[in-house]
């Protein structure tokens, strides 16, 4: 396997942890990703972080309720799964950052 990672990060307007967890768990599975583990943390007094460990890398969400938005980031070594996942989210992104990193 070639050392290659596709990375996409940006902001979405949803901040509800239950909605985010359910929506992105479903989309990751639909995209073909192998979800190995999921961890979450609730901050006091508000805020949430979710992290999905994937067989193909990882996906993370960090909510910023004070600003009414969440930061999401996907890193994947599987281009096909990555492209499908990103294509399903194009209407949700507030700003875009899209990178492909090749490691020596």
Segment roles from a protein language model:
Residues 1-104:
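Polybasic/polar functional segments that serve as interface/processing modules
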């Amino acid at each position: 396997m070639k050392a290659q990672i596709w990375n996409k990060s940006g902001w979405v307007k949803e901040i509800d942890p239950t909605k985010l967890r359910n929506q992105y768990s479903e989309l990751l599975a639909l995209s073909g990703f192998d979800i190995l583990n999921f961890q979450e943390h609730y901050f006091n007094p508000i805020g949430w972080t979710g992290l999905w460990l994937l067989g193909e890398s990882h996906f993370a969400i960090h909510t910023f309720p004070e600003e009414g938005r969440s930061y999401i980031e996907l890193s994947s070594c599987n281009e096909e799964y990555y492209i499908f996942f990103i294509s399903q989210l194009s209407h949700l992104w507030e700003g875009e950052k899209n990178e492909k990193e090749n490691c020596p």
